[in-house]
Structure formats: C-alpha cells, structure tokens
Design a protein with these regions (language model features):
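C-terminal regulatory/oligomerization modules of transcriptional regulators
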Residues: 1, 5, 107, 122-142
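N-terminal leader segment of winged-helix/HTH proteins
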Residues: 1-31, 100
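Short alpha-helical elements of helix-turn-helix
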Residues: 7-11, 31-42, 67
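Short, locally clustered residues in the helix-turn-helix/winged-helix DNA-binding domain
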Residues: 14-17, 42-46, 106
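Charged, amphipathic alpha-helical coiled-coil/dimerization segments
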Residues: 21, 71-130
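Alpha-helical DNA-recognition elements
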Residues: 26, 72, 134
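Short capping segments at the starts of secondary-structure elements
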Residues: 47-51
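Residues within helix-turn-helix
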Residues: 52-53, 64, 90
Length: 142
C-alpha cells in the first residue's frame, strides 16, 4: 500500500518524522546510536553542563525520554553526569569517548543532511526546517 495523505496535522507530521528518522538512523548504522541520542550529543557538545530538564527543553522531548536517552549515552560511556546545585539536579557533559564518537559520526550525519536536501530540494528543506522550528516553538511555549 502506498503512503496515504492523512487528514490531520499530527498524523502527517508523524509520517514526516518517521521518514526523516529512518534516513538519519541509516547513516548512524552500526554506531548503536539512535537519532535522539546523536542529537543529545550534539547539544551537549555545544552547551556542556546542561541539566536533564534543560536538554529535554532544548531538543523538544519530554523529561522521561531525556532521562532514558541520557542513561543510554552514559551507559555507552559517551556522557557523564554530576550532581548540580540542587541534589536532584544532574548536569551532563560529553566524555572524550563521546566527543570522538560525535566527530566520527558527523560526516555521516552531514551526508544524511545532503541526502535530505537532495530529495526535497534545498529551498524546500530549509523552509521545512524553519516552519518546523516555528511550529515547535509556538506549540511548546506556555
């Protein structure tokens, strides 16, 4: 059966999210990382010391998903946590192994970016990225 044009925004956006996730996770291949884990590494590389809550907010995932994602990257030795000013707070940084993994995978990730742009066209891809950010920002704001 071919892909259906769904009547609601939620279903349509989930179709796009699944298709994009498949494209990016193919390039991650045997690394063992999923797209959300790679994204978490990217964010921690740019902003070390984020709390679990801050990371969740930065990438637009719920607290439970962020906790699970960070536990997996910690288990893989890619990030480590320490107690923040509040004993319940965890602050996260990449380990040297995490930094190496990120550098190793970055060319593959960029290849996925190029493949995405090639399939959609650069202008359409950039427009979709902008519209996605605007929608997420507006829908997630209180």
């Amino acid at each position: 059966m071919k892909l259906l044009s769904l009547p609601c925004y939620c279903g349509s956006l989930r179709q796009v999210a699944r298709a994009v996730t498949v494209l990016y996770e193919q390039v991650l291949g045997e690394s063992g990382l999923h797209a959300t884990q790679y994204t978490a590494l990217q964010v921690l590389d740019e902003a070390p010391g984020l709390t679990t809550t801050e990371l969740a907010q930065a990438i637009g995932i719920d607290q439970t998903t962020a906790t699970r994602t960070l536990a997996l990257v910690k288990k893989g030795g890619l990030a480590t946590d320490s107690v923040g000013s509040d004993r319940r707070e965890r602050r996260w940084v990449l380990t040297s192994k995490g930094q190496t993994q990120l550098r190793t995978l970055r060319p593959r990730w960029e290849a996925a970016q190029e493949a995405f742009e090639k399939r959609l066209g650069r202008r359409a891809a950039m427009a979709l990225k902008r519209a996605s950010y605007q929608a997420a920002s507006r829908l997630m704001s209180n």
